[in-house]
Amino acid sequence: MTAVSIRRPIRILGIDPGLRRTGWGVVDSDGNRLVYVACGSVEPRDTLPLAERLLAIHDGLAKVLAAHAPAEAAVEQTFVNKDGAATLKLGQARGVAMLVPAMHGLLVAEYAPNLVKKTVVGAGHADKTQIQMMLKILLPKADPKTADAADALAIAITHAHHRGAAQRLKAVGA
């Protein structure tokens, strides 16, 4: 007698952190099958002090988690640019983006921007237009209103793709 494995879809939250706009996207993943659930962005007012903007990102993402109940989350890694102060502020937004799902007990994975692009488009230096075109193919029902929401969906897709490979490696003891 063989054991029957009942595979269930897993709900994944992708997050593209930013101080002006933090994109989020939710997909259900069942093996190679992806189903669009929702996407949007948290947009704190530019006039708020930094601490209040971070709080707005926290509260917005907490509402997304409450509304969509993801099982896992993925966040894009921060790239370092020439403006050190801007990089530090983006890092603070990214910290909040990682903290909120972790506070809800979720696994939080991190992916480099080039890996996200390579996974979704097939090229590590793809532009935002190419990502949005591939999203229409991979998630036909998705209609992200911002590039940040589209990027967040791409991050969720990347996690769906790579989590399976990581689980297979773990299963064989690699």
UniProtKB/Swiss-Prot annotation:
Top class in the EC scheme: hydrolase
Highest taxon, organism lineage: Bacteria
EC id: 3.1.21.10
Entry annotation: catalytic residues: D16, E76, D148
Broad class of where this protein is predominantly found: cytoplasm
GO molecular function: crossover junction DNA endonuclease activity; DNA binding; magnesium ion binding
Positions annotated to bind Mg(2+) 1: D16, D148
Listed GO CC annotations: cytoplasm; Holliday junction resolvase complex
Subcellular location: Cytoplasm
Keyword RNA-binding set for record: no
Cofactor requirement: Mg(2+)
Binding site for Mg(2+) 2: E76
Cofactor annotation remark: Binds 2 Mg(2+) ion per subunit.
Cross-referenced InterPro entries: RNaseH-like_sf, RNaseH_sf, X-over_junc_endoDNase_Mg_BS, X-over_junc_endoDNase_RuvC
GO biological process: one example: DNA recombination
The keyword Cell inner membrane appears for this protein: no
Record field: catalytic activity: Endonucleolytic cleavage at a junction such as a reciprocal single-stranded crossover between two homologous DNA duplexes (Holliday junction)
Alphabetical keyword list: Cytoplasm, DNA damage, DNA recombination, DNA repair, DNA-binding, Endonuclease, Hydrolase, Magnesium, Metal-binding, Nuclease
HAMAP family the record matches: RuvC
Complexes and interactors: Homodimer which binds Holliday junction (HJ) DNA. The HJ becomes 2-fold symmetrical on binding to RuvC with unstacked arms; it has a different conformation from HJ DNA in complex with RuvA. In the full resolvosome a probable DNA-RuvA(4)-RuvB(12)-RuvC(2) complex forms which resolves the HJ.
Chain's role: The RuvA-RuvB-RuvC complex processes Holliday junction (HJ) DNA during genetic recombination and DNA repair. Endonuclease that resolves HJ intermediates. Cleaves cruciform DNA by making single-stranded nicks across the HJ at symmetrical positions within the homologous arms, yielding a 5'-phosphate and a 3'-hydroxyl group; requires a central core of homology in the junction. The consensus cleavage sequence is 5'-(A/T)TT(C/G)-3'. Cleavage occurs on the 3'-side of the TT dinucleotide at the point of strand exchange.
Similarity section: Belongs to the RuvC family.
Protein's name according to its UniProt entry: Crossover junction endodeoxyribonuclease RuvC
Gene symbol of the encoding locus: ruvC
